[in-house]
């Protein structure tokens, strides 16, 4: 449920902020990550792409209630040219290559290990971000619409 996911996210963000510089952009004024730099929500369409692109690591944590599909944030991060570190979701693994186009983690310890690794390995991190940016292009509206129209024609 949403409450449990909120607690998990807060715990993960606190664990990150205990070791690393962390900026959090949120519309949730009640969220307080003590050691993080908290930012108010900014315009998702005009300003967030720049944040995604300029951040060393962008974290995606899918709601527990989402058992299939992919958060739009994954596409947005990759589309902006950002490096995406996301919790493991089977559907993400079907569409993107872990460790080549984005990076997935399975638990808090795995996430912290991967954060440390990719902060220390900038060239590898940047190559993964570039590969992710290239990979997400196949999901443009034109390509998806073409796929849907072909699928409809076959049925």
Where in the sequence are the language-model features?
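Nucleotide-sugar donor-binding catalytic core of glycosyltransferases
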Residues: 1-66, 83, 89-92
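Glycine-rich phosphate-binding loop at the start of an alpha helix
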Residues: 45, 49, 71, 126
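Short alpha-helical segment that forms part of, or immediately flanks, the ligand-binding pocket
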Residues: 49, 72-79, 93
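Glycine-centered loop/turn motifs
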Residues: 98-99
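Conserved acidic donor-binding segment of nucleotide-sugar-dependent glycosyltransferases
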Residues: 102-108, 118-122
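Hydrophobic alpha-helical packing elements
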Residues: 111, 124, 128, 144-148
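A short, well-ordered alpha-helix in the C-terminal region of glycosyltransferases
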Residues: 124-138
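C-terminal alpha-helical cap of glycosyltransferases
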Residues: 141-155
């Amino acid at each position: 449920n949403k409450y449990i996911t909120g607690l998990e996210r807060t715990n993960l963000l606190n664990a990150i902020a205990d070791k690393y510089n962390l900026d959090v952009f949120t519309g949730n004024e009640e969220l307080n990550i003590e050691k993080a730099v908290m930012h108010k929500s900014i315009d998702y369409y005009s300003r967030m792409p720049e944040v995604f692109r300029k951040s060393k690591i962008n974290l995606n944590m899918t709601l527990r209630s989402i058992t299939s599909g992919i958060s739009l944030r994954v596409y947005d991060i990759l589309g902006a040219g950002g490096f995406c570190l996301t919790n493991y979701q089977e559907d993400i693994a079907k569409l993107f290559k872990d460790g080549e186009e984005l990076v997935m983690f399975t638990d808090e310890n795995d996430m912290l290990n991967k954060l440390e690794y990719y902060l220390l390995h900038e060239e590898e991190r940047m190559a993964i971000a570039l590969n992710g940016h290239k990979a997400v292009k196949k999901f443009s509206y034109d390509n998806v619409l073409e796929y849907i129209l072909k699928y409809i024609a076959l049925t």
